[in-house]
Amino acid sequence: MKDKDSLLQNAGINTRLTHIGNDPFDYHGFINPPVVHASTVLFPNARAMETRTQKYTYGTRGTPTTDALCEAIDALEGSAGTILVPSGLAAVTIPFLGFVAAGDHALVVDSVYGPTRHFCDTMLKRLGVEVEYYHPEIGAGIETLFRSNTKLVHTEAPGSNTFEMQDIPAISAVAHRHGAVVMMDNTWATPVYFRPLDHGVDISIHASTKYPSGHSDILLGTVSANAEHWERLKEANGVLGICGAPDDAYQILRGLRTMGLRLERHYESALDIAKWLEGRDDVARVLHPALPSFPSHHLWKRDFKGASGIFSFVLAADGPEKSRAKAHAFLDALRIFGLGYSWGGFESLALHAYLNDRTVAKAPTDGPVIRLQIGIEDVADLKADIERGFAAASAV
């Protein structure tokens, strides 16, 4: 397998996704790893039990199934180790709890995922951690926000719902000069299109619920760390007793095999629709980093290899008093798009993004923000469905 591992390092992404994670000959040649259903692990003797020298000691600390997924993620991320947790949000909260303490100051991008903000404003505040939000366009200017007690920077690129890009290498360089750890939610791009650890990030976070699963049927998160921060992350996870289930790990590993192909379709279809939306009278503007018209497009072009299937547009409105009514009319007229909060699955989804919680990066004021998750349906059918939405909104 070592010869194969060496070959895979320089192979294309779909070849790597097909083969990473486990050696079939570790399991008598079976192409997929076993799903181990056991919480208890037996020891051969009292000495082994006392020293815990064997590889597996208890179900929460790993199984052959969960290890196969962790090894696959490490191969994709270039990380020293990965933990599995029950959801994408848990993948955010665990490193926070592992790397900050009472009296610390943390910097969090203002375009952050809403539930992450809620965690920061409630749980971290109760624990005595001060959170300050920064503008996603700040780049190296983040230096002015650092204090002697700043211990962590949490980034998310692109931003949630409005998709602002960040200068991740510049932010990471500043943070490291001040001795702060940098973590990033990279769910949008996945390691297929962006590898955070290659750009200075210490801890990479993914909601595997999204593209790694691809079928809207699994909840799971992964957190991957570089060598400097791996032991502390692993300790935090063990102390908190949070782990991913073997069945879920198996399904995510299964999803990885086709993730590259699915992402190609999501990327191609979403960008096609985003370009089609630009310049329409129904649309005030399109928020997609891969569009040359997008303000931080240059950062996407510099750092990312592609884009996923989720973006937003601002629905044209005659004034703020009609904004919500137009958004609801648009959404209620859709028949192929479902109305749902998640993304990364095979099906297209839409929602009205509420951005009133932002404190630094103000939300668009020229109309309601409609977020689209573009699935794998035929683009012509999705465009026809969007036309139905526009017709309904124009009648308001």
From Swiss-Prot:
Entry keyword set: Amino-acid biosynthesis, Lyase, Methionine biosynthesis, Pyridoxal phosphate
Family the entry assigns: Belongs to the trans-sulfuration enzymes family.
CDD domains per UniProt: CGS_like
Catalytic activity: L,L-cystathionine + H2O = L-homocysteine + pyruvate + NH4(+); an S-substituted L-cysteine + H2O = a thiol + pyruvate + NH4(+)
Protein name (Swiss-Prot/TrEMBL): Putative cystathionine beta-lyase
A Gene Ontology BP annotation from the UniProt entry: transsulfuration
Disulfide bridge positions per record: none
Pfam families attached to this UniProt entry: Cys_Met_Meta_PP
Cofactor(s) essential for the protein: pyridoxal 5'-phosphate
InterPro entries: Cys/Met-Metab_PyrdxlP-dep_enz, Cys_b_lyase_bac, PyrdxlP-dep_Trfase, PyrdxlP-dep_Trfase_major, PyrdxlP-dep_Trfase_small
GO molecular function, one term: cysteine-S-conjugate beta-lyase activity
NCBIfam families, sorted: cysta_beta_ly_B, PRK05967.1
